[in-house]
From Swiss-Prot:
Annotated region (Disordered), positions in chain: 102-139
InterPro entries: CHCH, CHCHD4
Primary residence: mitochondrion
Domain notes: The CHCH domain contains a conserved twin Cys-X(9)-Cys motif which is required for import and stability of MIA40 in mitochondria.
PANTHER family cross-referenced by the UniProt entry: COILED-COIL-HELIX-COILED-COIL-HELIX DOMAIN CONTAINING 4
This protein's record includes keyword Membrane: no
Membrane spanning residue stretches: none
Pfam families assigned to the protein according to its UniProt record, in alphabetical order: CHCH (PF06747)
Organism, scientific name: Xenopus tropicalis (Western clawed frog)
Protein name: Mitochondrial intermembrane space import and assembly protein 40
Domain of life where this protein originates: Eukaryota
Amino acid sequence: MSYCRQEGKDKIIFVTKEDHETPSSAELIADDPNDPYEDHGLILPNGDINWNCPCLGGMASGPCGEQFKSAFSCFHYSQEEIKGSDCLDQFRAMQECMQKYPDIYPQEDDEDEAEKEKQNKEAEAFSTETSDTKEESSS
């Protein structure tokens, strides 16, 4: 016996083996690529950049959003043989802006150095413990 149960926002449908083996009669409606309310990826069907795409991680709306949009647009629309090679000024402006907000835009080098420093301290502590243990066992 098939039945349906609502749990909060979820609808749970239990079906029998026979129901599951019967071909579905559900009609799928094709997405309208021109629907302005439909979710799209980074590039919209018309070729424009979707600044609301979650894939940008909020970069387009942060304190350096305008610089990011300028650099990203330049790169996206670049016709140079080496794509984006004509966008150096925009990327420099974006980088300079991001350096003003290190809490929002941490530098990868800073993170890498901090992680390496932490690992070195842990390794030193471990080697000190190991040598102390060896000295105790040899006594």
